[in-house]
Amino acid sequence: MVNVLKGVLIECDPAMKQFLLYLDESNALGKKFIIQDLDETHVFVLAELVNFLQERVGELMDQNSFPITQK
């Protein structure tokens, strides 16, 4: 039997990959989304969840950046 899944290859640094693995393990998106963990900088994920992943990564980046205040 063959299972076909539509996926997207993501290339990222190891720190971002750890964040993606954390989201996958904690079922933050409601289900597992990583199809295959390929190497230290590549993962293959479900195509249907790419937009939501981009939002979550954007939220993480916003939390890690500081706004520039005007004096």
Curated annotation (Swiss-Prot):
One Pfam family cited in the UniProt record for this chain = Tfb5
Q: Where in the cell is it found?
A: Nucleus; Cytoplasm
Q: Name one GO cellular component term.
A: nucleoplasm
Q: Which UniProt keywords apply?
A: Cytoplasm, DNA damage, DNA repair, Nucleus, Transcription, Transcription regulation
Biological process terms in GO annotation: nucleotide-excision repair, preincision complex assembly; transcription by RNA polymerase II; transcription initiation at RNA polymerase II promoter
Does Cytoplasm appear among the keywords? yes
Q: What does this protein do?
A: Component of the general transcription and DNA repair factor IIH (TFIIH) core complex, which is involved in general and transcription-coupled nucleotide excision repair (NER) of damaged DNA and, when complexed to CAK, in RNA transcription by RNA polymerase II. In NER, TFIIH acts by opening DNA around the lesion to allow the excision of the damaged oligonucleotide and its replacement by a new DNA fragment. In transcription, TFIIH has an essential role in transcription initiation.
Q: Which family does it belong to?
A: Belongs to the TFB5 family.
What's the subunit arrangement here?
A: Component of the 7-subunit TFIIH core complex composed of XPB/ERCC3, XPD/ERCC2, GTF2H1, GTF2H2, GTF2H3, GTF2H4 and GTF2H5, which is active in NER. The core complex associates with the 3-subunit CDK-activating kinase (CAK) module composed of CCNH/cyclin H, CDK7 and MNAT1 to form the 10-subunit holoenzyme (holo-TFIIH) active in transcription.
Q: Which PANTHER family match?
A: GENERAL TRANSCRIPTION FACTOR IIH SUBUNIT 5
Q: What protein name does the entry list?
A: General transcription factor IIH subunit 5
